[in-house]
Each structure stands twice: as structure tokens, then as C-alpha cells.
Amino acid sequence: MQYPEPIAKLIESYMKLPGIGNKTATRLAFYTIDMNEDDVTNFAKNLISARRDLHYCSVCGNITDEDPCEICRDTARSQEMILVVEQPKDVMSMERMNDYHGLYHVLHGVLSPIEGKGPDDINIANLIKRLQKTPAKEVIIATNATPEGEATAMYISRLIKPAGIKVTRLAHGLAVGSDIEYADEMTLLKAVEGRQEI
């Protein structure tokens, strides 16, 4: 038996989200149908609002509803350190530890020849331009501990080092293949404190 078209379309929509397979999408679709109409309307409005009102900061590439973002506008933050991450969610993970007070730069991906992603496909060029205009003395590369993350870190390091800027990499505490997003605050703090020059 096939589901009625509205349910099938809803399931299909949920399956476009990362990590959501057919079973979970079906469960979410039926849960949505059982929600009261006001909650469904608010849910839909919030989805539309997030998509419409959020954009990437013109300075760092983080997701924001203002430009530049709150972090880039914060004059109390150290202008001498820029922590480079893969995705906006990684900024939120780093901010949870409440111990890093520098700036960020979001790449929106990593180098991945298998996926056809080269340097022009991620936010590296803007990082280089930014470093030419800022007093940054250190760039901390916090890409994930994956082969693509490591390759991206080495590539960025080779681009930046000739400018005389110290380039470091998050250290111990992060297992190979792990994502920053899933690390706890203490692990992230130890990784930042133990960063190593590359």
C-alpha cells in the first residue's frame, strides 16, 4: 500500500535532511500530521524564516541574521587569532567551551578530490584576503580529524606560512575521524590548549 501523496511528499522532504532515513522520515511525517495546526504553522514559519533571514557573514562566513555577525563585531575579542573551522555548527561547538576569545573563519567544507571539491569550492580565498587586512598573528586550524580535514589543514598552512603568520592545529583529545561538533567542551578546551604548530 502506498501512502497518500501529501504524506509521501512529506516523507520525501524529511529524507532530504542529513541522517534521516525512510523509517525516521516516516515517523516524523506521521508525528507532524498529529501535531495541532498552530504548531505545524509555527514549524513551517520557522523553517521559512530561518531560510530567508539567515545568511553567511561577509567577514568570517558564519551563519548570522546580521552582517557582520555578532562575533566579528565584538571588539573585546582578540583580533590576533583566527580559528578556522569547516562548518558554522563548529563555531557553535567551540563557543560552548567559553574559553576561546578570538575570531573564526568558516570554510564551508574541506578539500575532497573524491567529491570534486578543490580550493575554489570552499572559503579559502576569503581567508587569505582577510589575513592581508587583519593583525592576525596566529591561525588555528580546527578542521575535523579526517583525511580531508588533514589535507585541508596542510594546504591552508602552506598558503599562510610564507606571510609569517603562525599556523597551529588542534591537538590531542580529538580522535582520528571524529567531528568537532560531537566533542564535549573539555575535549575541545584541551585540543585548543595543546594545539601544535604545523
From Swiss-Prot:
The record's Pfam families line, in alphabetical order, gives: RecR_C (PF21175), RecR_HhH (PF21176), RecR_ZnF (PF02132), Toprim_4 (PF13662)
Q: What is this protein called?
A: Recombination protein RecR
Starting at the broadest rank, the lineage of the source organism is: Bacteria, Bacillati, Bacillota, Bacilli, Lactobacillales
Record function comment? May play a role in DNA repair. It seems to be involved in an RecBC-independent recombinational process of DNA repair. It may act with RecF and RecO.
Q: Which UniProt keywords apply?
A: DNA damage, DNA recombination, DNA repair, Metal-binding, Zinc, Zinc-finger
**Zinc fingers (C4-type) by residue:** 57-72
- Specify the species: Latilactobacillus sakei subsp. sakei (strain 23K) (Lactobacillus sakei subsp. sakei)
Q: Where is the Toprim domain?
A: 80-175
Q: Name one GO molecular function term.
A: DNA binding
As for family, the record states: Belongs to the RecR family.
